[in-house]
Amino acid sequence: MHSRNRRQFLAGLPAIGLIAAHATEDQPLEHIIFGSCLDTHEHPMLDRTLTLPRDLFVFMGDNIYADKGGIPMMQEKYALLKSSRFFQGLKNKPILATWDDHDFGQNDGGADCPIKKEAQVEFWNWLDEPADSPRRKQEGVYHAQSFGPAGKRVQVILLDTRCFRSPMKKVTKDKAMLGGTSVPTDDESTTILGAEQWNWLKNVLKEPANLRIVVSSIQFAPEAHGGECWANFPHEKRRMLSLLQGHTAIVLSGDRHWCEFSRDGVFDFTSSSMTQKHPRGTPTTNKHRIVPKTYHLPNVGHLHIDWAASAIAVNVIGEDGEAKIEQRVSFTKLQIR
């Protein structure tokens, strides 16, 4: 097997290490809890999360904040998270994770991050990935895991939006938007995922699944807000939508420290932050927002799969355990056309 094809194959192997715990092909997934932006390990929202119905938990990035202290701080923060009551309470069910900039090692970082290789080692150490795991040998933390039997199979695809990402196009501060100075580029030689990860994704999408959940640390649907999002690389966004054509899929994203539900070719449900409230309390402009309400206090997302009705319900859950944003979507509407 060609070395590139072999790496693509290995990245799609069934999970091993901690993230394999309790995974089964026989039991269909019904309840997925997901969250991002975890800056403390003791918080009422984390306690509430452990009480929610859960077949799988997904960390969507910024799982620690260690972009200013190098590898020693990263090791310390991962150790604190790993020993926390919250993380220990999650381990009775499968856990999946990807990273964003603050656990990658550089704020808004991309391919030029000087400690990305060392950060990847610490990421897999946190998840107890075995020393001989194929995932430790590839560049980037992208991977996929399938759950459930034929007819009720869910494929969770965790993207790495950091390791290969080209520098973002920036404007001066006097031209900044509410969310920052990042703007779309027209340079189609730039990338978010990189050639290797794109090739891997193409192959992973050939695997059988009734529902595909694509986890992106940054938002996919929203655009023109000045912060990090797929719309800053419009050719990459178009490429993703093209690859997803014909699939029943939803994107889960984090990063923004608020929650919203958007659609631009594919549904994008953003849940952020698990432990922080947004200081401004108002979102940036998003013409693709399909639910007017947004939520800016600590939260997690809950995706419930109703197999009998061929539909999903996605909710933002607050500290009180109540749903703050709710939306039900049929599998038919989730099909990318």
What feature does the model see in each segment?
Residues 1-4, 11-18:
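N-terminal secretory signal peptides
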Residues 6, 16, 22-337:
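Metal-dependent phosphoester/phosphodiester hydrolase catalytic core
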